[in-house]
């Protein structure tokens, strides 16, 4: 779609599984094209790309040796900050922001989850910047990739993308 798309809603469009591209004249106003104001157009394109990707921190993951250790970490977080604990199969969450793994998973120190409006778009954008995804870690839901880890750690943390 191109009609009705703007900087405030482009992320909603790109997150829809049936939409593969979006556009709109707001990125390249006729007056700026006529005036040769390509710096402004370039900046609008960068803003549109950023809004389309919609990167945000989803949660931080901490690695623990086993379920008992994970439970102890969550209990301390609950005791200190009254964070609600939710137990899962392979991990526990203390609030929605801290995932405590029940085993030593990817990342020396744990992992950082980054939400995005489009995992495939994020993979392409990161590749342009020299970041490679480990496609063996990709997870799919209904034929759509919803998660994948970067190949290299950042600061001792594995980093994975999550579909919003």
Label the model's feature ranges:
Residues 3-9, 18-41:
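Glycine-rich phosphate-binding active-site loops on the catalytic face of alpha/beta enzymes
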Residues 13, 48:
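Conserved, mostly hydrophobic/aromatic
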Residues 15-19, 54, 106:
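Alpha-helix termination/capping residues and helix-transition junctions
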Residues 27, 36, 55, 92-102, ...:
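Vicinal oxygen chelate
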Residues 41, 45, 70, 119:
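Aromatic/hydrophobic pocket-lining residues that form the small-molecule binding cavity
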Residues 50-74, 107-114:
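N-terminal beta-strand motif that seeds the catalytic metal site of vicinal oxygen chelate
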Residues 61-99, 121-128, 139-146:
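Core segments of cupin and vicinal oxygen chelate
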Residues 108-136:
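Mid-chain, well-packed structural core segment of small domains
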């Amino acid at each position: 779609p191109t009609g009705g798309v703007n900087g405030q809603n482009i992320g909603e469009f790109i997150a829809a599984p049936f939409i593969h591209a979006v556009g709109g004249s707001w990125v390249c106003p006729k007056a700026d094209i006529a005036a040769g104001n390509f710096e402004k157009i370039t900046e609008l394109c960068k803003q549109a790309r950023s809004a389309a990707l919609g990167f945000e921190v989803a949660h931080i993951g901490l690695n623990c040796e086993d379920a008992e250790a994970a439970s102890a970490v969550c209990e301390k977080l609950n005791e200190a900050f009254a964070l609600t604990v939710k137990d899962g199969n392979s991990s526990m969450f203390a609030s929605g922001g801290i995932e405590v793994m029940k085993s030593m998973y990817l990342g020396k120190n744990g992992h950082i989850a980054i939400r995005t409006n489009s995992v495939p778009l994020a993979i392409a954008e990161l590749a342009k910047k020299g970041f490679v995804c480990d496609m063996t870690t990709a997870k799919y839901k209904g034929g759509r990739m919803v998660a994948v880890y970067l190949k290299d750690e950042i600061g001792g943390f594995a980093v994975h993308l999550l579909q919003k």
